[in-house]
Amino acid sequence: MLRIRIVIACLLAAAPGPVAASGHGPVFGGAPPTLGRGTWQLDQAWMGRLGQGSNDDEQMLRTMLSVGITEDLQISGSLPITLNSGIYMTSGRTMAMMSSNQDVEAILGWRFQRRAVGAGARLESTVFVGGAVPLQEFRPDGMLAAPSFYASVATGYASRAHYFWVGGGYQYFGERQGDQMGDTVFFSAVYGYRPPFLRVDYPKPDLRFFVEAVGEHTARGIHHGFEYFLSGGDSVLIGPTALLLYKQYGLEAGMLFPVYQQKNLQPDEKFRFGVNFTYFFWRR
C-alpha cells in the first residue's frame, strides 16, 4: 500500500490540469472507448469473488496505468497486490481490462472503427491484445504458473443518454513442465443510462448507471500431463454498477450475481464485486 501511495502522489504532482474522462467504461464488461492522445489514466481497483467459505474467496488490489498514444491507440499495464487467494475457485477473468491472477499484464487497445450517428452519439469498435507474466511460481491450486496471451474485442453505441456495448475475448495460458491452466473464453453485454438531470457538461459531476452481464467458459487444466478434473467450468452473472465522474476523478463500483453456474465440483460463487478509483491527467 505504501508503494501505491507513493506512485499516486508522484502522478498527482505531475498533473497540471483536468482532462475529459473519455476512456472510462463499465466495471466488469468490455467497452470500446479509448483515451485521447497524451491523456494518462491511473486506476486503483479492488476486485473479488466470494465463494462458500474463506478458502474459496478471492480478493485483489490492482494498479493500472494507461496512456493514449493517438486518439484511437492506447496501452495499459497493471500490477497486482493479492489480499486473499482462493484455492478451489474456477480460474477466470474478473474485469475485462484487468487480470485476476498474480500477473504483470500489458494490453494494447486499437479503436479501428468510429462513426458519428447523430448529435453526441457514435458507433465504435476496439480490439485489445496483450500478455501477462506470472509473479508466482505456483498457482493457488498447485499448478505451475506460466505466461498467458489475451485478445478481446468490444463494440457498441454511446450517446449522452444511452450506452450499449457487447464484447468477447479469449485468454490462453502457456504450458510449463506438464502443467497448463485451462483457456478462458468470455463475453459481456452492458447497458448504461444517464438520467436527464445528470446530463451535464464538464466539470460538473457526471453519474451513469449500468446493468452488466458477463459469461465465462474455462476449459479444464492439465496437471502433470493429465486432465485436472477439479478445474474448468461455466458461469453467467448479471448485476448493477455505477460510474461517477467529477473533473479529473472517477469512481465506479458494482456487483455481479450468478444466474447459471457449472463448476466441475468446485465451489459456486455467491457474487463478485469491483471498486475502481481513477485519476486522469496530462503528462507534459
Task: Give residue spans per PLM region.
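Active-site rim beta-loop-alpha module in soluble metabolic enzymes
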Residues: 180
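Transmembrane beta-barrel domains of Gram-negative outer membranes and organellar outer membranes
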Residues: 21-160, 164-166, 170-173, 183-245, ...
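Bacterial N-terminal signal peptides that target proteins for export
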Residues: 1-7
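N-terminal signal peptide c-region/cleavage motif recognized by signal peptidases
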Residues: 14-18
